[in-house]
């Protein structure tokens, strides 16, 4: 490490200050020490690159994370420090300054500073004689960045620079503060080095603002400084410091590395801790769930146990009841038999017959008597009824008479009221006449007063109008005054001659409340200039005029004010007059009243002059008074008559009341008698009916009871059966619970074992780390000791502090580790305790809930039992009967009481009424007579009443009987309803219990089914994983082999191209390659083609170089080249060498080749180097992926073993349980059969005990039977479920097959139409040209196509017929093609696979070809560059591409991209795409251009840019295989599908069948001749012919467009494009495909998504996202007819790849 103090000179110090002798001596000693040092050491120090670096300051490094790569880069770059802001010293600088400067400098600083401009290590120091003066304060440098976790090493010294506050070091980093403990302070005196610098004249001259920029100047200055001041004390000091710094540097670096390592380890441990915590959380969750399940199970157990106990008690009770009932039934049977015998005996006896006859005769006599009595009673009743009617008639007559009397009285009252009303009216009239007479006397005076009033009112109106006018004038005047005041403010006032007017004006202002204004003193505030602003005289005139007008206005104003004051005075006068008139009016009214009174009292009045009128009035008044007196007398008489009438009326009313009361009393007595008789009869009938009803009821009760008992017994038997079922279910549930518990235990054990192993591993790791740290620390301590001893020998100071500090460091590190471990343990403990507490609390709560539930259930059960047992108890029945009797007795007593109470009340009423009657008897004789007559009638009626009452009683009895019967019926119905309700409730309860039991059973069933399904699923998943792992391994191996083979081939070819190749060496190379290549796909043809391609690439670079060197020559030859190209375009079918690069003539190449050989070689080296680098990278990636895959495989295998073991255990346990249950069931069945044989013939004389003993084992046997049935049912369900799963899978497979077939048929129809149209178009085009051969070929193909397309799914027999039906022309075609395969090796494998193989081969070939594409990429780039140069000259319009079937000539397609050579036209193979070699050259520029260019928008944008690098993207065709030939042959790209091993194919087919991936072909084909004319998806073909043509005879002109659109991405510079650009390009290509893909063959429609989606073996990882997006876009743009099938089959690999879990086999394949 070097000291870097910047580039600013030291501050000049004062020379006047004193110099100390001691300092001088110390300085001399240091100089001697430094001179003694060897020169070699100095040279080494200076020459070492480390010294020329400066550390970055704290400010620079803090908060910047730096990588070690950046550090290394910055250390290797030798740059100058930049002068930056002075913020204090850097970390390391300050450290070494603090270590080496010592405290002597601190003590003697004040002395030395005064005399010498010395270099203080705190302020600055030169760097090993570098020749530039460092700054006084530290400057930041951006040379290099230390890592974030870099910590400087300070030996624990405190640095206190008292004189310079800016030089105090403050370590801001918190991590560094850990290392500075309190022990550091005591180590100050260990390392104090005194240094006395020597004064040099050269240093004083250093300018403070000097800055050096450049490494050359830096070195020059260094050399100068060394040469000038070799012997100076300063130089020696700096060298010494540098030596020490180097040592410290190394120590620091070691420590930093250790720190970094420790931090990494800590991070790793933290990461592990987090993982462990997550695992712990997961386990706690699972524990909780399992506990919950366990508790639920326990609760269920408890509930079921309670139910079992309840049912057992019920069973026992029922057994007891059964025994009792059997005893009772026996006794009843005996009694019945005895009664029957008695009845028979009685029937035979004669005495009984006699008794019966006697009884019958007695009954007849009684009935006759009863009938006679009834008849007599009816007669009496009729007589009483007639008497009553007569009395009612009399009463009605009396009522009518009373009503007439009331009417008469009302008429009299009305007459009286009319008379009174007439009298009142006459009185009022007379009073009015008197008033009129009084008023007529003062009429004249009133008239006069009214006249005066009218005048006064008029005057008032006039004055009001005047007031209004005055007020309006006032408002106007006020406005004018405001105007005048404003004028006065402007300085306008009247002249002195009119002073009087002014005085008046001011007074009037004061009156109106306007303030006085001093007109003379007021200043003019505004000057108006309107007329002529230039003339001064006009202003004065204007002012004078204004003043005159104002004076006139003021005068008029004063006049108006005078008028206003006058009018106000007039108004006041008017008001006074009005008030006077009002007073006069009041006086007159009072006088009138007085006169009226005087006239009434006095005969004459002085006021009124006419006396005759007053006399007349008086006479009238007297007459009226007399009339009033007469009327009053009449009124009194009428009142007296009214009083009399009222009295008579009251008497009549009283009499009537008495009559009514008497009648009511008599009526009541008769009713009472009737009631008594009725009651007696009612009671007698009641007793009779009650007895009969009770007898009936008892019979019905017995019948019902028997029926209920039967139903009860049936229900009990059903309940028993159900209970048995429940018990069986419970036992099964218990077994399941036990299995679950066992599983949980095993899981826990495994988890505990894993935890233990993890803990052990952790402990081992920690121990290892501690040992490593300890060893490293020991080594560092030893090294540091040695270094410090060396340093001490130079400076005579033993720096023991270094060692101490290292020990401290080690201690600190250990302490940190301990603290971290303790913290971790504490956190773990806390977490565990918290979890335990939570669990305990939850368990307690659940336990409490369980207990409460159990208690509630027990209480409910007990209550139900008690309720059930109550009605069966004999005591309960006896109590019920006793209570019934009591109730009946109480009811009878209460009824009797009520009757007696009613009778007594009636008697009392009657007595009271009698007394009232006696009191109110009138003395009238008439009334007495009437009463007597009535009494007589009553007596007569009383005699008749009993007969009537009897008849009524009979009616009442019949009615009462009916009512009672109805009541009885109602009661019976109610009883029946209650019983039905009880039965319904009972049934509902039973149904509920049954439903609950069924639900439990179904739940358990579903749980079991779910468990089995999960187990099956896990097994399936495991098998899938195994298969995927194996596939991945196989694919990886194949990829690796292909990569190695391609690398070897390329290496050999590239090494060969640099030398001049000889024919002999070619054969050797071929042999070497064939021997080295492990894979069988290598062939002579492939090797030749590769070689040809490389040669062509190197040849094509020459014209590029020529063009760059000589542009003028290029311009001259442009015309010639275009002519040549045109001439070549006209000649069809010419297979000359111009096809290689038609833009350059061969002669020119020959001349230029020698000159440009060197350039070519350089380009070769560059290209090859790039290729090799890429291949190496790919290899490394492959190896990494392999390692990861192996790890994943191991992990998977381990998991599989575990799972298998667990599943096997579970299966074994289940089987054991089932077998045990079956054995038990068989045993129980045997026992049951034995018992049944015993119980088949039970004797009649068996006792109750024997029956009981027989019943118990029967119930047990039934239970066991139920249990066996349940186990069988469970087994059956399992089998059914497995069968159902298999059937559903088969159904799904069939559905898939059916859909595939349907879709294929649809696509076949569409393809057929499309091909027919295309062929018709080709025929038409060929007709224009007039080529008869082509027409014949096309016609023959049309016929074959039509035949084949009519039968898309044909059997082998059909294919044979089609084969025979092929026309001669197609056979001729094949023969021609075969004849052209001269030089090609026929041993290339052509894989004709089975149906199931078709999908698998596609995916595999895709994976296999990925490295091939990468290897061939750079060659293709060179080809593109060369072709780009040749295409430049051709216009945008290019001719339509056509394929000639016979001779293979074709035209260029307009939709080709510009940077692709016209020689490589993409054609469609059977399984992928290849590039077709064009035979023809370009035709005229003016030839018609097709509108296909719109289909390639992104290719058009690329233009003339040659692609610098072409890396195959994920959407490129996966089955490309590029082959090259010699330069003589036509260059073409062929498509191969070579699978070397048929065994692997078979294996793959098996696997594909296992995965249900089936793709039946449209047409079966075994032979090439069979497959002609139809696109076969089952057979994949390899092109062997040199001619690039379609083996299947498709019209190529139309099919090239989609193939081009898919393939064109190979020619785009995808390596340098961003993701967004690529996605845009893909979108555009997909737009093109939308219109063209439906017409592609079936093979291509299935392949294109495959090319995009299946990319397992591709090593580049950054392409995965692009792959997904491309696939989505492709699937969205393709039409439904094409997309449906591939999407179904090819989305599966994508989803599997996306799985990034630890267990997944596709961990990092992307």
Curated annotation (Swiss-Prot):
<comment type="subunit">
    <text>Interacts (via N-terminus) with PLK4; the interaction is mutally exclusive with a PLK4:CEP192 interaction. Interacts (via C-terminus) with CPAP (via-N-terminus). Interacts with CINP. Interacts with CDK5RAP2, WDR62, CEP63 and CEP131. CEP63, CDK5RAP2, CEP152, WDR62 are proposed to form a stepwise assembled complex at the centrosome forming a ring near parental centrioles. Interacts with DEUP1; this interaction recruits CEP152 to the deuterosome. The interactions with CEP63 and DEUP1 are mutually exclusive. Interacts with CCDC66.</text>
</comment>
<keyword id="KW-0225">Disease variant</keyword>
<dbReference type="GO" id="GO:0036064">
    <property type="term" value="C:ciliary basal body"/>
</dbReference>
<feature type="region of interest" description="Disordered">
    <location>
        <begin position="108"/>
        <end position="139"/>
    </location>
</feature>
<dbReference type="GO" id="GO:0007099">
    <property type="term" value="P:centriole replication"/>
</dbReference>
<keyword id="KW-0905">Primary microcephaly</keyword>
<keyword id="KW-0970">Cilium biogenesis/degradation</keyword>
<feature type="region of interest" description="Disordered">
    <location>
        <begin position="1"/>
        <end position="27"/>
    </location>
</feature>
<feature type="region of interest" description="Disordered">
    <location>
        <begin position="587"/>
        <end position="611"/>
    </location>
</feature>
<dbReference type="GO" id="GO:0016604">
    <property type="term" value="C:nuclear body"/>
</dbReference>
<keyword id="KW-0175">Coiled coil</keyword>
<feature type="compositionally biased region" description="Basic and acidic residues">
    <location>
        <begin position="108"/>
        <end position="123"/>
    </location>
</feature>
<dbReference type="GO" id="GO:0005814">
    <property type="term" value="C:centriole"/>
</dbReference>
<feature type="modified residue" description="Phosphothreonine">
    <location>
        <position position="1241"/>
    </location>
</feature>
<feature type="coiled-coil region">
    <location>
        <begin position="615"/>
        <end position="664"/>
    </location>
</feature>
<dbReference type="GO" id="GO:0000242">
    <property type="term" value="C:pericentriolar material"/>
</dbReference>
<feature type="region of interest" description="Disordered">
    <location>
        <begin position="1120"/>
        <end position="1142"/>
    </location>
</feature>
<dbReference type="GO" id="GO:0120099">
    <property type="term" value="C:procentriole replication complex"/>
</dbReference>
<feature type="coiled-coil region">
    <location>
        <begin position="902"/>
        <end position="993"/>
    </location>
</feature>
<dbReference type="GO" id="GO:0098535">
    <property type="term" value="P:de novo centriole assembly involved in multi-ciliated epithelial cell differentiation"/>
</dbReference>
<feature type="compositionally biased region" description="Basic and acidic residues">
    <location>
        <begin position="587"/>
        <end position="604"/>
    </location>
</feature>
<protein>
    <recommendedName>
        <fullName>Centrosomal protein of 152 kDa</fullName>
    </recommendedName>
</protein>
<dbReference type="GO" id="GO:0005813">
    <property type="term" value="C:centrosome"/>
</dbReference>
<feature type="region of interest" description="Disordered">
    <location>
        <begin position="39"/>
        <end position="79"/>
    </location>
</feature>
<feature type="compositionally biased region" description="Acidic residues">
    <location>
        <begin position="14"/>
        <end position="24"/>
    </location>
</feature>
<comment type="function">
    <text>Necessary for centrosome duplication; the function also seems to involve CEP63, CDK5RAP2 and WDR62 through a stepwise assembled complex at the centrosome that recruits CDK2 required for centriole duplication. Acts as a molecular scaffold facilitating the interaction of PLK4 and CPAP, 2 molecules involved in centriole formation. Proposed to snatch PLK4 away from PLK4:CEP92 complexes in early G1 daughter centriole and to reposition PLK4 at the outer boundary of a newly forming CEP152 ring structure.</text>
</comment>
<dbReference type="GO" id="GO:0005829">
    <property type="term" value="C:cytosol"/>
</dbReference>
<dbReference type="GO" id="GO:0120098">
    <property type="term" value="C:procentriole"/>
</dbReference>
<keyword id="KW-0963">Cytoplasm</keyword>
<comment type="similarity">
    <text>Belongs to the CEP152 family.</text>
</comment>
<dbReference type="GO" id="GO:0098536">
    <property type="term" value="C:deuterosome"/>
</dbReference>
<keyword id="KW-0242">Dwarfism</keyword>
<keyword id="KW-0597">Phosphoprotein</keyword>
<dbReference type="GO" id="GO:0030030">
    <property type="term" value="P:cell projection organization"/>
</dbReference>
<feature type="region of interest" description="Interaction with PLK4">
    <location>
        <begin position="1"/>
        <end position="60"/>
    </location>
</feature>
<keyword id="KW-0206">Cytoskeleton</keyword>
<feature type="coiled-coil region">
    <location>
        <begin position="700"/>
        <end position="772"/>
    </location>
</feature>
<dbReference type="GO" id="GO:0005654">
    <property type="term" value="C:nucleoplasm"/>
</dbReference>
<dbReference type="GO" id="GO:0019901">
    <property type="term" value="F:protein kinase binding"/>
</dbReference>
<feature type="coiled-coil region">
    <location>
        <begin position="234"/>
        <end position="490"/>
    </location>
</feature>
<dbReference type="GO" id="GO:0051298">
    <property type="term" value="P:centrosome duplication"/>
</dbReference>
<feature type="coiled-coil region">
    <location>
        <begin position="1170"/>
        <end position="1241"/>
    </location>
</feature>
